Amino acid sequence: MYQFSGKLKTFSLALIIIGVIGTAFSFYSGSQKTIEDAKHVIEASHNVGHGSSHEETAVHNDVADLENHTAKADTHVAADAHDTSSDKEHAEHELHVLHQLQNRPWSAFYVALFFSLGITLLVLAFYAIQRVAQVGWSILILRVMEAITANLLPTSIIMLVVIVASVMHLNHVFPWMAEGTVDPMSDNYDAIIDGKSGWMNATGFLIRSIAYLLIWNAYRFFIRRSSIKEDTANDGNKTYKKNFTASVIFLFLFMITESMMSWDWIMGLDPHWFSTLFGWYVLATLLVSALTVIAFFTIYFRSKGALPGVNDSHIHDLAKFMFGFSVFWTYLWFSQFMLIWYADIPEETTYFVMRFTEYKLPFLGMVVMNFVFPILLLLNSDFKSKPWFIFIGGFVILVGHYVDVFIMVMPSTVGSQWYFGIPEISAICFFVGLLIFTTLRSFSKVSPIPAGNPFLKESEHFHYYNIEHSDEEGSTDHH
């Protein structure tokens, strides 16, 4: 069995502690933001081009005075009314910028939280697919996937805390939760949000979120216990068949809840916008990341001798999935972007306008990281079985898909008030440390080999014919 070393425990706990301290500092700093800070930000943003704008205004006013000399008094009255309206607009803009500044620590934490929870969830879904498809090649890495899904419970609890905080108006992350958005008598009334209030309401949002988390964690709890029981059951595969049935039910519920989750937790950040393939898009970005994490831990455990039956063919198949779903993600990204951009419907293009202006570098950069790098590093069949190629390509993939989630969240919650600093780094450290700790701790508690699985022998003899093995491997890996 694998031994969770003291050094790795210390390392993972250190990451968690660093993350907690940095996140606490970020939340404290965010809570200290005032309307004066918002005014300074607005003033700084107006400095660029202020002189030329001033000159244009002066010229325009001179021309207007010459053309409307006889209506000077009326102009002054209109100007007074305009000043009153302008003051109100300025106050609203300052408040909006203040909310963006206060949102930043929440948003940075939410990006890392959603990414970590999503990866864990998709590892669980990929695990269920192996059960339902009754495949043979992946049996030796089932315990790796089970160990990774140990991260589901803590991230689910944290997500529930963030959701409850949002419902209690402790942040301004979800704009549809603002007061008065569905009250026709309020100055803050929003007809579009009101039209969607049957779905976007705090009670329904909270109930659905709890339901998602309960369904996912219930399956994980059941399948983990039943998988261990499978090793010693000796009951004519009855336990195995129960696990198959449970996995079928879970996958059915997963496909529904994953789409609904993406609408609630991500698309709900832009309540005026919608995309019919958004659930698939979120699925693709999380699935590629999940496969990468599975490959990383499999390579690590194999290097420590904990997975003696895993050979280059298993690694090769994981890399094939990483490559294939990177292409699938690119297809969905291009389909969503191209159709919306060229249809040029204002209600839809507004989503990409902010991302293509204020976030142009990360928006285009993630396409390079999520498509170009996987193509270059993983297209060659030989490279797919080389651990260091997979680590390089996988690291870029994970960074690229973190940026993808960053782009989904930040433009909606902080607008142009974004940069990469302590809040983002702290959140990443916390959830990386949590993933390492929960995975290694879970893997060290049980046998790494699912001895009771009827397809175990097939996995032990799995060999991809196109891979060149060494003489030692060749003697044991062939059928």
Predicted regions and their residues:
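Extracellular/periplasmic helix-loop-helix junctions in multi-pass membrane proteins
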Residues: 270-275, 345, 383-387, 408-423
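Central hydrophobic cores of alpha-helical transmembrane segments
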Residues: 388-399
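Hydrophobic cores of alpha-helical transmembrane segments in multi-pass inner/ER membrane proteins
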Residues: 120-125, 157-158, 209-220, 284-299, ...
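Short, highly charged, low-complexity non-transmembrane loops/tails of multi-pass membrane proteins
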Residues: 42, 449-470
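Membrane-interface transmembrane-helix boundary segments in multi-pass integral membrane proteins
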Residues: 276-282, 347-367, 415-439, 443
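Low-complexity, proline/glycine-enriched hydrophobic segments characteristic of transmembrane helices
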Residues: 27-105, 186
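Transmembrane-helix bundle segments that line or gate the permeation/cavity pathway
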Residues: 26-44, 113-231
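Long, contiguous internal "core" modules enriched in hydrophobic/ aromatic residues
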Residues: 9, 18, 59, 79, ...
